[in-house]
Amino acid sequence: MAIALLTGFQPSAQPVSGMDIIKEGKAACVIVIPAKPLPAERFAADELRYHLNRSGATDFQIVPEPVLASRHSLPKGRIYIGRCRATADAGISTERMRRFSGKIRQTGNRLFLVGRDEPGDVLKGLDFLGTWRKSAGTVIAVYDLLEKEFKIRWLWPGELGESIPVFRNFRLDETERVAVPKLRQSRLRLVNWGNAGWNNPDNAARFRQAQLRWLCRQRFCLEEDLSYGHGFKDYWNRFGKTHPEYFSMLPDGRRGLLPGGISGRAMLCVSNPALHHQILADHQAATAALPPSESEFAPQNVINLCENDSPALCTCPQCRAWDAPQASFATHPYWGKGVIPTLANRFPALGSNDGAGSDKGAPSLSDRMTRFYLTVQAAADKIKPGMVVFGYAYANYAAPPLRVKLNERVIISFVGWPFYPFTADRMAAARKDWDGWRAAGVRLVLRPNSMLVGHNLPVFYAVRLGNEYRHAWKHGMIGSDFDSLTGQWATQGPSLYTMGRLNSRPDLTVETILDEYYTAFGPAAAAVKDYFTHWEKVSDSMTDAHWQKVTGKLGRISFKNWLNAGNAMFPPEAMQEGRRLIKAALHAADSDIMATRRVAFLESGLTHAELTLAALTAQQKLQAQPSAVNRKAFAEALEKLRQFRRQAEADGIADMGYLFRYEKNGSGWWK
């Protein structure tokens, strides 16, 4: 527990126990680092000083441990970071700690922040997707302290999004705890399309670095790597000619690819024992040189059975015998009538949409796929007992099995959250599927594509997706892997913050998290809440029937061309009400400088959305009535949008590269 005294408040007496961090607006302690700090320890010290210097004192120092004795003018308090000698002398060891775990211990006038650290730069060590792989437990300890004791919140990337309370005095009670990841893996995939769409490459670089730091502060990290992708993308090239029996039998008796198919989409004949033998042989060859590991998720202890990116297709008698009986097999165009789709049409033709199962009269292939998982696992156990297998809940095997029971050594990557819209019925169906998989005995990794919606428009999904996340966390979730962080901070901020905050605090309610966000707007908090409540109502008003009309007119909508549906989602009257509410928020901010800056950030996002929709409207008018006048109007709308982005990109309101890519490829802009 911390006793924090806000500016202007003086207590009658201070408690005897504990340690002063800030006293009368001055640093009451010094930050101590090892003589030769690891990059993670240096990063942790820098992050701690950065935040403390904004919490009420500006004179916190970082001092190497060996020179402490010669610095007589330093404050008496000590905050030891990482592997200091004083930490070892205090009997604190990280040897048995989990990866990405940190210890916090305060006793007397000493505070120890230490964790399981590995060599390598923290931010530079994150991979292309923004994945934090190198353990930095000391950094985790620092963030845990800043969040829980100092009540610091990171609403969005950059200084403006840092909500840091200011104290005249701050005293920390004696405490000891360990901060550990809530999941064995957590990932919110970073979108990184380079500098296209940015006017200034330096702004692009700063934006990406700020997002990486935000991901770290929200503690997205890989204690274990549970992200197994499509596992058989090379099989057609390897075995298509020599072992065609490894692959799906199509309704016409051929084994192989769908019309227009490519090698990486070839689907397997999962009941074939020869295929099982090949999979195990490949696994043994790939892991033979690896030493034994106690981790259940080490590569040598895991077999990846995640099928390629297509629905299950095999019509051979053995695979069909593995299916649970369903009347829909006889009536379905593919299974009952032999209609073979093209590769491009494979998902809707087999009754699924971008990985999420549907109820369009298509049978579920989950019993077949789960028997595949169990059969290979049983064969692997004969070689090495206790093997873990990874599979998908995807496409036409997204629903839980009807008959097969599994075990906790089967890990299912669950893709089954709806893409859009997030109607109550769709979310209820997704929860039913999740609970069904858990009841079948598996553990799950949440792997949705749901956060790819919205382009730069004010889509609001914090409540519906946030509540489903909390349910998953309580019911068998051991990892997450979200696609993706699209970076639309000024229009989708509450939703992005909610999904980030839940990563480190899934115990918090969505309402509590949203209150954290709104409270940061000071006197404008209620008005900002009203503003986003409006967008929540607009977002939740989209019904399946309305969406089907939209897609019936525009064709299939995915994240690649979601903007094309923007005017149907956000009609003029909705945008006008949003403009009225943001003006009210600006007025409510009054003379509060920080509140005004933050509301202005949101207002810039709304202007950005308005200009984007104006360009879309001009394009749709041109498509309906091609003419020189309409062509000029569209060009002028695009230029106005371009000029706004050039002026606003340094403010970090949006990932301009993400928008440029899908406006160009999905909507035909910027040619």
Predicted regions and their residues:
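Acidic, contiguous N-terminal accessory segments
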Residues: 2-3, 9-99, 168-176
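Structural motif
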Residues: 33-37, 80-85, 114-117, 192, ...
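Short, internal active-site loops enriched in acidic
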Residues: 68, 308-313, 394-401
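Short acidic, S/G/P-rich loop/turn micro-motifs used as interaction or catalytic elements
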Residues: 36-40, 85-88, 119-120, 310-312, ...
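Substrate-binding groove of N-acetylhexosamine-processing glycoside hydrolases
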Residues: 165-166, 178-179, 356-671
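Structural recognition of the beta-strand scaffold that forms the well-ordered cores
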Residues: 30-32, 78-81, 112-114, 189-190, ...
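Feature activates predominantly on carbohydrate-active enzymes
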Residues: 44-47, 51, 94-370, 381, ...
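Extracellular/periplasmic catalytic domains that process cell-envelope and extracellular macromolecules
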Residues: 23-25, 71-74, 104-107, 296-298, ...
